[in-house]
Amino acid sequence: MSAYPKFDVILKALNLSSVGVIITDPEQKNNPIIFVNTGFENITGYTKEEAIGSNCHFLQGDDTDKEEVAKIRHAINEKSTANVLLKNYRKNGTSFMNELTIEPIYDDNDHLYFVGIQKDVTTEHNYQLELEKSLWEIEKLSTPIVPIKENICVLPLIGSLTHDRFQHMSDYVSEYMDNGKEDYLIMDLSGLADFNEDAVMNLVKFHGFMKLTGVELIITGISPKFAMTLMRYQENLSSLTTYSTIKEALQFY
């Protein structure tokens, strides 16, 4: 008795799977599909009769990520594995996010095939986008830009200026300035919990970034401890305008 399951058992198992399974033959012209399982039909809406003989390109649209498609092409050329996330389209025209893995396999005659395992991760992808959007909104709330006058706004910093927070802050300020007409940005540091070397380096970078935008950066709320740390970077911050308080700064602008 054979230790291996019969072909019809394997086929039945494949068709019971909820993931899509396709097999293509890259040794034929245009690498056509030669097998799809029921999972593929359920995900895409295409029947096996419609899919077999076609290249997988028919699932793509104009907004399918070209870089991800290039990874697939490279893997096929190199006879290697690829893992990609593609925006694909069902037969009814609706889109879905396809988490696709392709693997080269050989039969007993060393004939090359590619097996593709596809999973509809649209729900997970949309959740991730919503999560990122929510985190961005939270970050905006933790980095409030307050308009004071027609051409002046204030950015009060509270807590710690970590690398990640600095990056989010830079992105948010850049977006804000692109849509505004401010000439001056007052950054108030009086609420910062600490001001270490990393925070100073981030401030140096931010100062350079603001100079490129044409918006003058004004720093207020510098404690004596902060001032001592800043002294070591005087060359980089020599053109930086500072005041004790926001109120004092506004007297000059």
Swiss-Prot record:
GO MF annotation terms: photoreceptor activity
SMART domains given in the database record: PAC
S-4a-FMN cysteine sites (modified residues): C56
InterPro entries for this protein: Bact_StressResp_Reg, PAC, PAS, PAS-assoc_C, PAS-like_dom_sf, STAS_dom, STAS_dom_sf
Pfam families: PAS_9 (PF13426), STAS (PF01740)
Keyword Flavoprotein set for record: yes
UniProt xrefs under PROSITE patterns: PAC, PAS, STAS
Keywords noted in UniProt: Chromophore, Flavoprotein, FMN, Photoreceptor protein, Receptor, Sensory transduction, Transcription, Transcription regulation
Domain STAS, residue spans: 142-253
Domain (PAC): residue spans on this chain: 80-133
Domain of life according to the entry: Bacteria
Domain PAS, residue spans: 6-79
Post-translational modification: FMN binds covalently to cysteine after exposure to blue light and this bond is spontaneously broken in the dark.
PANTHER family (alphabetical): BLUE-LIGHT PHOTORECEPTOR, RSBT ANTAGONIST PROTEIN RSBS-RELATED
Known function: Exhibits the same spectroscopical features and blue-light induced photochemistry as plants phototropins, with the reversible formation of a blue-shifted photoproduct, assigned to an FMN-cysteine thiol adduct. Positive regulator in the activation of the general stress transcription factor sigma-B.
Protein name, per record: Blue-light photoreceptor
